[in-house]
């Protein structure tokens, strides 16, 4: 269905599938008040910046592709596949799974759990009131916040950003952080980090208690820094460097044969 709204608001509802192509490129902005399918899928393509108020396909898939920027106030679907050449912002998403690709900025928020098969943009910001699982994160900078646990995987580097969650699990085929800059983490309890390259992480919690960290690099250095008491366990790297503002308890720490193990703590150091 080709549509030329001429800059006016669009509302489309159907019992089954919706396939819409908004062809207007002259108004500068496509405004869609509502897209709703009771028992089918929704597929929308636009040629310019697009604003969507509500998009619902609770029993189907939601697909949007735009050549410009895209904002969606409310997205409720079984699965979502969203692509924007510019920035992409989803203010509230409820979906079993999400694939989202943007050029500059990708921003996603949910009052539920967030399961993303793919999040890709120069900068990715995601916030979940529940658990957060990202199967593939491709970005130069990530800002991730979850009230529950965060489980993040990338087939590339995760070089910079901040991640805050109850527990954090990170797995990268490349680096986590850089040699010059740490990946900033804040957890209530535990961090597990695994990388094919280097690991440089700083856990920033200052609340009373301790942080438990496991960090494993296949081929490169591991650097860990915390503000409070640290339990570092099952950690290995070419060189392992550990600094904590509290007590340090180290369990099963391994540097390479010609590598260096360096530990510094404001309080006691206990090595098991």
Regions found by a protein language model. Give the residues of each.
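Extracellular lectin-like interaction modules
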Residues: 1-272
């Amino acid at each position: 269905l080709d549509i030329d709204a001429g800059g006016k608001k669009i509302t489309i509802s159907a019992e089954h599938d919706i396939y819409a192509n908004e062809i207007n490129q002259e108004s500068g902005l496509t405004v869609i008040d509502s897209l709703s399918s009771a028992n089918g899928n929704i597929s929308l393509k636009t040629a310019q910046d697009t604003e969507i108020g509500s998009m619902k396909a609770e029993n189907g898939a939601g697909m949007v592709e735009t050549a410009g920027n895209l904002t969606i106030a409310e997205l409720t679907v079984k699965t979502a596949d969203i692509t924007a050449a510019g920035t992409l912002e989803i203010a509230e998403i409820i979906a079993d799974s999400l694939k989202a690709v943007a050029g500059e900025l990708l921003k996603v928020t949910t009052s539920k759990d967030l399961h993303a098969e793919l999040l890709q943009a120069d900068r990715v910001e995601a916030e979940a009131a529940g658990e957060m699982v990202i199967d593939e994160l491709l970005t130069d900078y990530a800002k991730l916040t979850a009230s529950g646990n965060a489980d993040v995987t990338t087939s590339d580097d995760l070089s910079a950003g901040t991640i805050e969650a109850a527990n954090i699990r990170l797995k990268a085929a490349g680096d986590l952080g850089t040699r010059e800059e740490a990946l900033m983490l804040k957890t209530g309890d535990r961090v597990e980090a695994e990388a094919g390259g280097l690991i440089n992480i700083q856990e920033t919690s200052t609340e009373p208690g301790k942080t438990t960290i496991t960090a494993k690099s296949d081929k490169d250095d591991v650097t860990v820094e915390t503000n409070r008491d640290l339990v570092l366990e099952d950690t290995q790297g070419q060189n392992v460097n550990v600094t904590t503002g509290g007590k340090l308890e180290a369990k099963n720490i391994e540097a390479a044969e010609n590598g260096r193990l360096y530990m510094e703590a404001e309080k006691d150091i206990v090595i098991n």
